[in-house]
Curated annotation (Swiss-Prot):
Main subcellular location: cytoplasm
Localisation: Cytoplasm
EC number: 2.7.7.3
Pathway the protein takes part in: Cofactor biosynthesis; coenzyme A biosynthesis; CoA from (R)-pantothenate: step 4/5
Subunit structure comment from the entry: Homohexamer.
Pfam families per record: CTP_transf_like (PF01467)
Function: Reversibly transfers an adenylyl group from ATP to 4'-phosphopantetheine, yielding dephospho-CoA (dPCoA) and pyrophosphate.
UniProt catalytic activity: (R)-4'-phosphopantetheine + ATP + H(+) = 3'-dephospho-CoA + diphosphate
Gene3D superfamilies: HUPs
Keywords: ATP-binding, Coenzyme A biosynthesis, Cytoplasm, Magnesium, Nucleotide-binding, Nucleotidyltransferase, Transferase
Binding site for substrate: 9, 41, 73, 87
Protein's UniProt name: Phosphopantetheine adenylyltransferase
Cofactor(s) needed for function: Mg(2+)
């Protein structure tokens, strides 16, 4: 079975992320969403909370699995027999950075390719960073995040 992986910090998962996951789930029989533990990043939600929020957000997708990881992505890819890495690219700045990561991951995994998904037009401006900034300044993020994330933010 072809399996792809969509790695990210997802702090929090946004509707842009969810759109990419849903589109990937239509194309591929198995999509793994790998929620990264990034000690160098100051996250709003813990790894466990982020994994659970992603799980709740993709519960309607039967071919999507969610897990957290702290290892090198290349090692996770080898452990799960991954065929390709899914990445979202919003801008040319994203693309340049992702191109470098794709080359590195291809080297470290002995050939696993990265597939770049542009966002749907209505999500092109959405990022986890922007969502956190709006939230931390008291703004309304209801239209930018899945319902489980919005509820978790309201409860904080």
């Amino acid at each position: 079975m072809t399996s792809v992986i969509y790695p990210g910090t997802f702090d929090p998962i946004t509707n842009g992320h969810l759109d990419i996951i849903e589109r990937s789930a239509v194309i591929f029989p198995r999509v793994l969403v790998a929620v990264a533990n990034s000690p160098s990043k100051k996250t709003l939600f813990s790894l466990e909370e982020r994994v659970e929020l992603v799980r709740q957000s993709v519960a309607h997708l039967s071919n999507v699995e969610v897990f957290g990881f702290s290892d090198l992505l290349a090692n996770v890819i080898k452990q799960h027999n991954i065929s390709a890495i899914i990445r979202g690219v919003r801008t040319t700045i994203d693309f340049e950075y992702e191109l470098q990561l794709a080359a590195l991951n291809r080297l470290l995994t002995k050939g696993v390719e990265s597939l770049f998904f542009p966002p749907a037009e209505k999500w092109v401006f959405v990022s986890s960073t922007i969502v956190r900034e709006i939230y931390l300044h008291g703004g309304d993020v209801a239209e930018l995040v899945p319902v489980p994330v919005f509820n978790a933010l309201k409860a904080r």
